Amino acid sequence: MNTVSQRPEFFELHNGSKSPLPFSSAEYERRLTALRQLMSDKGLRAVLLTSMHNVAYYSGFLYCSFGRPYACIVTETGCTTISANIDLGQPWRRSYGDNLIYTDWKRDNYWRAVNHVLPETDLVGIEGDHLTLAARQKMASLNSNLQAEDISNDIMTLRMIKSAEELSLIHI
């Protein structure tokens, strides 16, 4: 039997095929392009999305937390969901982009997975209206060089402009 120190902190699992998402690949790319423009304007190399609505909006994956944290990290070139091992391969199948699964074997594996995906950067955009004070402190304790900038209002402004696909779904 493996000891706790031999068990992985996080891993990737691409099992099965990608499931149909609520929107087309072009729609997710449109959203990510707009977010990346915001990132560029603010000098951010990454955004850490933690709310259910923004993770779903940018990745297509709607999580149920089961008391565990979830995220979507958008970088200049990628979109990666961070999910708990309890969901195994489902987040990868049900999201646009990549997925990294963290395990419960050791405390703070979620933050280790987040730090693994974040690029070498000193500034990351966050949802200040969703990330708790405890989570911000944990993020800072595991990466002392990382500064967080609240972009929650900017993200909400981006989401206010609806695409044709969004309007079509709303009218159903």
Roles of regions detected by a PLM:
Residues 1-169:
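A composition/biophysics-driven feature that prefers long, compositionally simple stretches
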